[in-house]
Amino acid sequence: MPSANIGDIEIYFEEHGQGEPVLLAPPSWWPSDTWHVGVVPFLSRRYRTIIFDCRGTGYSSKPNHGYNIDQFAQDCVGLLEYLKISRAHSVGFALGGQIVQAIAIARPELVGTLTIAAAGAGVKTTSGVPRETRNSDDDEIAAHGFERFIRGHIENTHMAFEREFYEQHPEVVQALSDALWKRQTSPEQHRHHYEARRTWDTLGNAPRVKVPTLILCGAGDEVNRGGSTPVGTARRLAELIPNSELALVPNVKHMTFWDGEGALHALENFLRRHPLP
């Protein structure tokens, strides 16, 4: 299995396709298998598509430390350096959007373009007050079991998918649910990743981003994040990040890249208009 030695851990990664490099940063506790559902096949036709397991997930090392956005970003920088990539398109979904934002701030020379998809607001709401962050996941795991808890993030229409797509494409829903569960680790590792959400101020850090940026979100992504929603965060990010673009994809909820191909086409359009030098 391909892995990069980064500091005191190993990060599992895969590369698919040729062309300008695109780094895909996953949400908290999502193994890289999930990108194989639609996203890698779409992007790898034109781009060198790089996916990886964050520390604590999949095949990567599972230390008991380093679960914060800055460290996740440092791990990504280490992976790019290991692959001898001097600049890449950096794309992140949900918590992954915070990770690539942190990379763009700490090491802007490595980031040709930045795409923040369906990111949370971080430690503050869109109005700037501290976000309510009560971890109820342990209660849900105890009530329903770990597998049902994990798959439940995908197998629904109230948060994940628009009902029409969900009913017409059950194979996509099942494939994504299977990929999310396939290499899950443990409730303890899940807890580490949940706590990482409390370590980054997405909106507060937004003005520090100086690279071409696409803010991407489903127009129907109203999942409650303790006083904020991804679509509300997206609109605010577009106001705060200089010269950024906002793309709200119609008829799409939180599964941005999987609830139809609208977000993938928006991403491809942005990347084509911003080739790496």
Q: Which functions belong to the PLM regions below?
A:
Residues V209, I215-C217:
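Short beta-strand/loop motif that positions the catalytic acidic residue
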Residues F149-R198, G204-N205:
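Conserved alpha/beta-hydrolase catalytic His-Asp/Glu region
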Residues V249-L264:
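Catalytic histidine-centered segment of alpha/beta-hydrolase-like enzymes
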Residues Q101, I105, G112-F146:
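Flexible "cap/lid" loop of the alpha/beta hydrolase fold
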